[in-house]
Amino acid sequence: LSEAEWSSFAEEVRVLRRMGVSAISTDLWWGLVEGRQAGLFDWSYYDRLVELLARHDMHWVPILSFHQAGGNVNDDFMQTIPLWLWGKLLELHPELGSVRDLQYVSETGDTSMEYVSLWADSYVMPYYKSFISAFRDHFAGWTHLIDEVNLSLGPAGELRYPSYNAHDWGNYPNRGTLQCYSPLAEQDWRRYVKEKYQSI
């Protein structure tokens, strides 16, 4: 934000506080904080935010957002998840054939980069945990100001498939597109069928 935008925000916080509002909730974007490389955290934006809130006796409800901002209804801000993540996971896990293993792949063959597919949870979970731990440690001195912490997972922060997002047909409403065509999703389906019926 520019200095003018910070000043405008401070005035809005003052007005809200006078009206009796005691806390505000903001997204805390994983890609903004850890976007440059794994384990390198830049909390400067959120440090300034928390200091501003504290000056106005306003509490904070951070939403740890592990998805992309932008590309959905009413989005006016763009922030990807950490782009290094895709290459890092491929480097550490040679059994993964390509980035498509980690992404939702639709029936039309399109992929979504806004969130790591649920079929790749075991690969990305250590990075989620690391980020949550880093958040906890960094803001330990502000716990009196934090009323609760929310996790925002899945496309647009909703635990759902990206079945009607812009990477596919892009219009809403429609029936949506199936998102179960990544190699990991297909392996999971085969495993399920074999366990249930003993053969494919």
PLM features: what roles do these ranges have?
Residues 1, 67, 154-156:
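Generic structural motif
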Residues 1-7, 120:
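Active-site mouth loops of central-metabolism enzymes
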Residues 2-3, 33-36, 158, 163:
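Generic alpha-helix signal with a bias toward terminal, lower-confidence helices
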Residues 6-101, 125-143, 147:
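Aromatic-lined substrate-binding rim segments of carbohydrate-active enzymes
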Residues 87-200:
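Polysaccharide-binding and catalytic clefts of secreted carbohydrate-active enzymes
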